Amino acid sequence: MLEIKVPGTSANFGPGFDSLGVALSIYNKFYVEEIESGIYIEGCEEKYRNDKNLFYVSMKKVFDKFGYKLKGLRIKIEGDIPESRGLGSSASCIVGGVMAANDFIGNKLSKEEMLEISTEIEGHPDNVAPAIFGGMTAVVKDKDRIYHDKIDIDKNINFHALIPNFILSTKKSREVLPKTVDYKDAVFNVGRVALMISSLISGKYENLEVAFEDKLHQPYRKELIGNYDDLIVKCKKNGALGVFLSGAGPTIMAITEKHREDFLKNMNEELRILNHKWNIKKLVVDHKGATVISKLNGGI
């Protein structure tokens, strides 16, 4: 039996739309074993316990590519990454499936090749890249090639995920975006993403409130998220260095200095009085990315 651990991710970082992502200390685990026949999946909703399951689909894509003849599979999922909340749950299933299949075929794929296959399934690389490589990643897809690099951000920060009790699909979140943007709005974002990356590396935190501003996606997506503006104000009032929409939402991500232990307590109080139920979870950067945890004797 194979055990795979994949971190959740937060993409976009405000102005870094579709180009930045970070792996965080929230995980999905997948246990996989080959059996004589059939597909058996547990640990997820009934509607995902079939051959349309994203983890299984991702494994099969690798098997088909290499002509691996699969008998049957038993898959168990232990997930802490909430679904459709902007924390990379789909990316974790894709990366986990590709990595598991790679182990089955004798590790014929490099991480770069796993990134290519995962991006082909996901459609864009900003979540799958950090899920594979760990850390904060800048990534660009140009034609058939994916360019990426790790960003060594200052270690003196924590991430706080504000997670609501409602979901928001990526499809719906993309539908509200305009087909074109003003030139001045593009310039607005370019300047801020450069300042944001530089400040996260240098630790010049006073720049971050401005550097996390965005005009390309958050102004449109926030209309789908109850309490959004109120939460941004509350996070900043309680010491957040920067606040941004995690992925397509609806999770909101706040960054604080590590010594600000009061942020978690204060925000828990703030969240209690909102008209939607929100939870807050403190996270740190995961620098390892997806890993094969163990190969165990015996079944699931």
From Swiss-Prot:
UniProt catalytic activity: L-homoserine + ATP = O-phospho-L-homoserine + ADP + H(+)
One GO term of the biological process aspect: threonine biosynthetic process
InterPro entries (alphabetical): GHMP_kinase_C_dom, GHMP_kinase_C_sf, GHMP_kinase_N_dom, GHMP_knse_ATP-bd_CS, Homoserine_kinase, Ribosomal_Su5_D2-typ_SF, Ribsml_uS5_D2-typ_fold_subgr
Subcellular location: Cytoplasm
Keyword Nucleotide-binding in record: yes
GO cellular component, one term: cytoplasm
Enzyme Commission no: 2.7.1.39
Top enzyme class: transferase
Protein residues bound to ATP: 82-92
The keyword ATP-binding is assigned to this record: yes
Keywords (A to Z) from UniProt: Amino-acid biosynthesis, ATP-binding, Cytoplasm, Kinase, Nucleotide-binding, Threonine biosynthesis, Transferase
Pfam families assigned: GHMP_kinases_C, GHMP_kinases_N
PROSITE patterns named in the record: GHMP_KINASES_ATP
GO MF, one annotated term: ATP binding
Pathway in which this enzyme or protein is active: Amino-acid biosynthesis; L-threonine biosynthesis; L-threonine from L-aspartate: step 4/5
Function recorded in the entry: Catalyzes the ATP-dependent phosphorylation of L-homoserine to L-homoserine phosphate.
Family statement drawn from the similarity comment of this UniProt entry: Belongs to the GHMP kinase family. Homoserine kinase subfamily.
Protein name: Homoserine kinase
Taxonomic classification: Bacteria, Bacillati, Bacillota, Clostridia, Eubacteriales
